[in-house]
Amino acid sequence: MSSAPEPFTHAIASRDGLFFANRYRFALVAEGQFFGLTLRGDELYCFEAGDQPWVPSRLGRIVRFRRSGDCVGERDILVEGLDNGCHQIDFFAGSCFVVDTYNQLILEYDSDWQLAATHQPVPPVRLGETGHDYFHINSFLGLGDSIFLLLHNGRLERPSEILEVDCAFRERRRIPLLERACHDVVRLEEGGFLVCNSLHGSLIDAHGTVVEIDALMTRGLSVGKDEIAVGSSLFGARPVRSLIPGFVTFLDRAYRKTARLHLPAAPTQIRRLDGVDLSLSCPAE
């Protein structure tokens, strides 16, 4: 009798579907173009773009999937009419926060999925503006009385920054990083940060390179108690990004590579299915 396959450990959002995966296999569980991904128990919440991210058609939405084993049920639509270019979403302090990247806003939704507040941690911009005030915020992490936002800064041709704000989104400090165009922000147990140095295929902290992953673009970072998962893919022109495949590289907490999985789509976000994940603002115990 053959043994049952190992259960999936991670959920992976991508431009071409939502996947479940572990170190050995993956499965497509939902069609769609997904960017942000978070979870509560067996419920997964995603930002889904209904059009190309740079198109101002406002077909973005927040959807929920209920997980049952290796599958999910039909999507529940919770919020509609969002900009297609939104990125990460996460629960923190009783609300769900959405990073409205192209408009440089943080949207806060209450438990009834009503818009409770629109926050401006940096000066807002109009869709499509790329001037000296466009930072391309792409990641959100709430901890204690602070919120950490990742400023990509790619078009500014200057290093990315971790922007720390209070819960009223007033700036406390900026932490400069090694390179521009970074993604994801995780705070480790000892207080240091871990970030995807996307253009150099590595993970970095506030001081330098922690580990080289590959020669691709790193994006999507999950940090569990014993295992790290990092997404990577080629960097393509906008019209073809949904066609580009990708990888998930698994490492132990000493940053030694333990496995590598080839996916048919480029990861945009990775979360542990058990919720014990430092990439979440409210990780499970």
What is the role of each PLM region?
Residues 59-68, 160-168, 243-254:
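Beta-propeller blade signature
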Residues 6-9, 41-42, 93-95, 144-146, ...:
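Short coil/turn segments that connect the beta-strands within blades of beta-propeller domains
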Residues 27-90:
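Blade-loop segments of beta-propeller domains
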Residues 243-285:
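Blade-level signature of beta-propeller repeat domains, shared across WD40, Kelch, NHL, RCC1
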Residues 72-82, 114-135, 174-178, 261-278:
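Surface-exposed loop and turn segments in beta-propeller and other repeat-based domains
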Residues 31-42, 83-91, 132-139, 180-186, ...:
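Repeated scaffold domains used in trafficking and secretory/extracellular systems
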Residues 179-188, 192-248:
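Loop/turn-rich, solvent-exposed surfaces of beta-rich toroidal or solenoidal domains
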Residues 1-4, 10-15, 46-57, 98-103, ...:
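Conserved beta-strand positions in repeat-built beta-propeller and related beta-rich domains
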